UniProtKB/Swiss-Prot annotation:
Protein keywords: Dioxygenase, Iron, Metal-binding, Oxidoreductase, Vitamin C
Name assigned to this protein: PKHD-type hydroxylase Dtpsy_0528
Positions with a binding annotation for 2-oxoglutarate: 169
Domain of life from the UniProt record: Bacteria
Record SUPFAM superfamilies: Clavaminate synthase-like
EC code(s) of this entry: 1.14.11.-
Length: 227
């Protein structure tokens, strides 16, 4: 399941983040790649331990906590602190699958990566190339969203970033461990929750159909969630 979420950040917020990121020192992104991914990764990143990365990452986390579509789709248990990357001058990231387990920064605690997220911080017309291509059961989906919009996709997916031939593609990226590990179960819960949300304004709050559907959702979540 690949889900686009509009306006996680406002245009004003994007401009503020970009002003700070554009003035920052960028490092070779290959230094943070795994052994196999290192050979296909050509981009730049902000140092994860920098005050800037941590402060901007916290801002994104606050926005995610008030984004209902993200909560519904991801059912987040743990979110890896957001990172920032930049692709320019032919920068690209070849086909790879994200690591299944990651240590949270500054701790010995591991998290499982169920979902990967890219939050776009550059408008599509600012750069050529730079599409996020995600392989799924129905073929390859190319994603290039407006600044402030975000895409969620399974971390198990083979994916790549095509070469940027003009301008710069700037984004934040991170991973989510979900309360519901199984992708099929998580998709069913998301579809059911979205149906409930669409039905809610059309019927009375005590409508038996709405009450029953809501009960089904929570009982399935109770069965499948692993807090």
């Amino acid at each position: 399941m690949l889900i686009s979420i509009d306006q996680v950040l406002s245009k004003t917020e994007v401009r503020d983040l970009r002003a700070q990121l554009d003035a920052a020192a960028w490092e070779d992104g290959a230094a943070t790649a795994g052994t196999l991914a290192k050979s296909v990764k050509r981009n730049q990143q902000i140092n994860d331990g920098s005050e800037l990365c941590q402060r901007l990452g916290q801002h994104i986390l606050r926005r995610l906590s008030s984004t209902p579509l993200f909560i519904s789709a991801a059912l987040p248990r743990t979110i890896y602190p957001p990172k920032f990357n930049r692709y320019a001058d032919g920068g690209t990231y070849g086909a790879h699958v994200d690591s299944a387990l990651m240590f949270l920064p500054g701790s010995h605690q591991q998290m499982r990566t169920d979902l990967s997220a890219t939050l776009f911080l550059a408008e599509p017309e600012e750069y050529d190339g730079g599409e996020l291509e995600v392989e799924g059961p129905f073929g390859v989906q190319a994603v290039k969203l407006a600044a402030g919009d975000m895409v969620l996709y399974p971390s198990s997916s083979l994916h790549r970033v095509t070469p940027v031939t003009r301008g710069a593609r700037v984004a934040s990226f991170f991973w989510i461990e979900s309360l519901v590990q199984d992708e099929g179960e998580r998709t069913l819960l998301f579809d059911l929750d979205q149906s409930i949300q669409q039905l809610t304004p059309l019927v009375a709050p005590d409508d038996p159909r709405l009450v029953q559907l809501t009960g089904v959702y929570h009982n399935l979540l109770r069965r499948w969630a692993r807090p």
